[in-house]
Structures are given as structure tokens and as C-alpha cells.
């Protein structure tokens, strides 16, 4: 017997949770999760992905402000800082144009695009056929990390 669970799918976020700046759209999904998108056509993706099927969540408390050429979005858990009209994919780790600062066990942790995460606990593998030895090198980054942050690339999850 096959049982089916109905899930309310509403991938379009509440407009009150969205902050746009030029080619960028930031969606504050929870105090700990900000969805970051860039589109030179300013056409953003609202379809569900395999990872996220519902983005219409209660809007968390946050503030956003533009000052001195930067957009800042702050929740009680993190602070995002974006250099307005810059491309986050072209980023200098010493002076990132997009960064998120959060607190992990009383210490500040900073994330920026393309930052390597040596403490990611990795995802899963489809099969162990022909596996020999350590299979961790096969695994992509997962949703949990000892670094205090993880990145989900929804472009690859459609």
C-alpha cells in the first residue's frame, strides 16, 4: 500500500520578507536563513526546488538600510552586508562585496561567496557500488556544517 502525504507547496515568499537592490534579491526566510539571488534581467526564480518547496514562511523580524554604498540586512542572528551594484561572484576575500556575519559559540563567523568550508559534514551518495576505501571525496557539501553555516545552491537542485 502506498501512502501519500500532501504538502502545501508555496515557493513564493511573502513580499514583506524580500529586499531588492539593483540586480540582487535577498529573501529573509528565517532569522538564520537569507536567500540570495542575482539576475541581470531582474527576473528572479520563484519556483520550488528539490530542496525548498515552501518559502512562504512567517516573516522574521529584520531591518534593512542603505548607507555609504552598502545595503545591510540584520536579524537577531546575523548581519548581511552587500556593496550596492557589485557582483558577489567577483569577490575579494580581504574586502568582500557580500558577506554575512553571525555568532557561533560567542565568536563572530564571517561567510562570503566561494568561501571554502572545511567543516561541512557532506551530503549523501546514491550508491556504494564499486566503493573502495574513503568515499568522502565523492560527496558534495551537505546542509550541516561545524562551521556554523552552509550554502544551498538551488540552481543545481531543480
Q: Which residue stretches match the model-derived regions?
A:
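Short, exposed beta-strand/loop patches in secreted or surface proteins that constitute
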Residues: 8, 17-19, 25-27, 59-66, ...
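Bacterial Sec-dependent signal peptides at the C-terminal "C-region" and cleavage site
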Residues: 2-13
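Generic low-polarity alpha-helical segments
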Residues: 1-3, 19, 90, 151
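N-terminal-proximal low-complexity accessory segments that begin disordered
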Residues: 12-38
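Catalytic and substrate-binding clefts that recognize carbohydrates or anionic sugar/phosphate headgroups
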Residues: 66-158
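Generic low-complexity segments that are intrinsically disordered, proline-rich and/or Lys/Arg-biased
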Residues: 12, 16, 59-61, 109, ...
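Short Pro/Gly-enriched beta-strand edge/turn motifs at strand-loop
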Residues: 8, 53-57, 123-126
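A low-complexity, Ser/Thr/Gly/Pro-enriched, surface-exposed linker/loop concept
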Residues: 29-68
Amino acid at each position: 500500500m502506498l501512502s501519500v502525504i500532501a504538502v502545501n507547496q508555496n515557493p513564493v515568499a511573502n513580499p514583506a520578507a524580500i529586499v531588492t537592490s539593483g540586480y540582487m534579491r535577498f529573501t529573509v526566510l528565517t532569522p538564520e536563513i537569507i536567500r540570495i539571488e542575482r539576475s541581470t534581467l531582474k527576473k528572479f526564480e520563484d519556483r520550488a526546488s528539490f530542496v525548498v518547496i515552501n518559502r512562504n514562511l512567517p516573516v522574521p523580524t529584520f531591518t534593512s538600510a542603505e548607507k555609504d554604498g552598502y545595503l545591510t540586512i540584520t536579524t537577531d542572528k546575523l548581519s548581511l552586508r552587500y556593496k550596492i551594484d557589485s557582483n558577489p561572484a567577483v569577490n575579494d576575500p580581504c574586502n568582500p562585496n557580500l558577506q554575512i556575519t553571525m555568532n557561533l559559540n560567542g565568536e563572530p563567523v564571517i561567510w562570503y561567496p566561494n568561501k571554502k568550508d572545511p567543516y561541512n559534514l557532506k551530503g549523501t551518495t546514491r550508491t556504494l557500488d564499486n566503493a573502495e576505501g574513503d568515499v568522502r571525496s565523492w560527496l558534495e557539501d551537505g546542509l550541516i556544517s561545524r562551521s556554523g553555516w552552509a550554502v544551498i545552491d538551488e540552481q543545481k537542485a531543480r
